[in-house]
Regions:
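N-terminal cap/lid segment of alpha/beta-hydrolase-fold proteins
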Residues: 22-63
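Catalytic histidine-centered segment of alpha/beta-hydrolase-like enzymes
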Residues: 272-281
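Conserved alpha/beta-hydrolase "acid-adjacent" motif
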Residues: 243-249
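Catalytic nucleophile-loop/oxyanion-hole region of alpha/beta-hydrolase
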Residues: 81-89, 103-142
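Primarily recognizes the serine-hydrolase "nucleophile elbow" in alpha/beta-hydrolase
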Residues: 127-195
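Short beta-strand element of the alpha/beta-hydrolase
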Residues: 65-74
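Short beta-strand/loop motif that positions the catalytic acidic residue
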Residues: 230, 236-238, 242
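Mobile cap/lid helix-loop segments that gate and shape the active-site cleft of serine hydrolases
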Residues: 29-40, 50, 160, 192-226
Length: 299
C-alpha cells in the first residue's frame, strides 16, 4: 500500500512538472519575424547622399495630417542588421492611424558608421521630417520616437540630444521636437551595458570607439542616462524574459529619470522576451500600441 501511494505521488509530481514545462511561454524569435510575409513596402525617401541614409515612409488612409512615429531598428548597432525587421511593426502602426518613418542609417561595419556617424544619421533622418512635411500630410506637433534594443537607445538619445553642449560632436542646432519616446527593450545606460558580458554588449565599444574609461566624454554625450532629464513622456517596454537586454536597463533608467523630474514609466511584460515587443502578432503588441497612444495623449 505504501509503495502504491509513493508511486501515485511520484506520478502526480511528474505530471505537474510536465504541465509547468508545457505552460512556459513560447517567445518570439528573430527567425519568427524574418519568416513573416513581407508587408507592403513604404515609400523610400532619402535624407542624405549616402546609400544608407534613407527611410521608409508609410501613410494611413485619409487626408491627414497624421501623427508620426519615427521607428529606429536595433541589431546591436551592427551593419548586418537593417530596418527590414521593423517593417511589420511599422505597417501595424500605420494601420492604426500613424504615419511611420522607419529609419535606416550607417552602422558599425559601414563606411562612416559608429561614432559619430550613426548618431548624426538618425538625427539627420529625424530632422528631415521638417522637409518631408511640406510634401506629405505629417503632423510634426505629434511625433513619437520608437526604437527597439540598440534602436531603443537611439530613440531615447534622439529625445535627449537637445541637452547636448554646443562643443559636442553630436550637437545639432534646433533638433525636431518630439512628444515622447517608446523604448522597446532599449539600452538606456550605455556605460553599464558596455561593461557587462554579452555579444551585443561587446558592440558598444565598437560603436563608441572605446570603453567608457577610454572615451568618457563620448559616453556622456551618447548615453541617455547621462542626458537626463529629457522633459518628455517616456515609456520603457521590457520583456521580463529578455536574454539580451536585462530588465535593470529599464528600471534603473526610469528611477533616475523620475528623480530628475521626468515622466518615465516601465511597462514590464512577464511572459515576453526580446522580440515579442516588435511582433504585431504577439500578446505584447497591444501594450506597445497603448504606449504610443499614451505619449500622444499628453498635452
Amino acid at each position: 500500500m505504501r509503495a502504491l501511494l509513493y508511486t501515485l505521488l511520484l506520478c502526480l509530481f511528474c505530471s505537474h512538472t510536465l504541465l509547468a514545462q508545457d505552460q512556459k511561454p513560447k517567445l518570439v524569435t528573430w527567425q519568427d519575424i524574418a519568416a513573416l510575409p513581407a508587408p507592403a513596402a513604404g515609400m523610400r525617401v532619402a535624407y542624405g547622399t549616402d546609400s544608407l541614409q534613407f527611410g521608409e515612409l508609410r501613410l494611413p488612409e485619409g487626408d491627414g495630417p497624421f501623427p508620426v512615429v519615427v521607428v529606429v531598428h536595433g541589431g546591436c548597432w551592427l551593419s548586418q542588421y537593417n530596418l527590414q525587421y521593423m517593417a511589420h511593426l511599422s505597417a501595424a502602426l500605420t494601420a492604426a492611424g500613424y504615419a511611420t518613418w522607419n529609419l535606416e542609417f550607417r552602422r558599425v561595419g559601414d563606411a562612416g558608421g559608429g561614432w559619430p556617424g550613426t548618431f548624426l544619421d538618425v538625427a539627420q533622418g529625424t530632422d528631415h521630417l521638417k522637409a518631408m512635411a511640406k510634401q506629405y500630410p505629417l503632423n510634426l506637433k505629434q511625433v513619437v520616437v520608437l526604437g527597439h534594443s540598440a534602436g531603443g537607445h537611439l530613440a531615447l538619445w534622439l529625445a535627449a540630444r537637445k541637452n547636448l553642449p554646443r562643443q559636442s560632436a553630436l550637437y545639432v542646432r534646433k533638433p525636431l521636437k518630439v512628444k515622447g519616446v517608446v523604448s522597446l527593450a532599449g539600452i538606456a545606460d550605455l556605460e553599464s551595458y558596455a561593461t557587462a558580458e554579452g555579444s551585443c554588449n561587446a558592440a558598444v565599444p565598437k560603436l563608441m570607439g572605446g570603453m567608457p574609461a577610454q572615451v568618457p566624454d563620448r559616453y556622456a554625450h551618447a548615453s541617455p542616462m547621462r542626458l537626463q532629464p529629457l522633459k518628455v513622456r517616456q515609456y520603457l517596454v521590457q520583456g521580463a524574459l529578455d536574454p539580451i537586454v536585462p530588465t535593470e536597463q529599464a528600471t534603473a533608467y526610469a528611477r533616475s529619470a523620475k528623480s530628475k523630474g521626468d515622466a518615465a514609466e516601465v511597462v514590464l511584460l512577464p511572459n515576453a522576451g526580446h522580440f515579442d515587443l516588435v511582433a504585431p502578432q504577439s500578446p505584447a503588441w497591444p501594450l506597445v500600441l497603448k504606449s504610443v497612444r499614451e505619449v500622444l495623449r499628453q498635452k
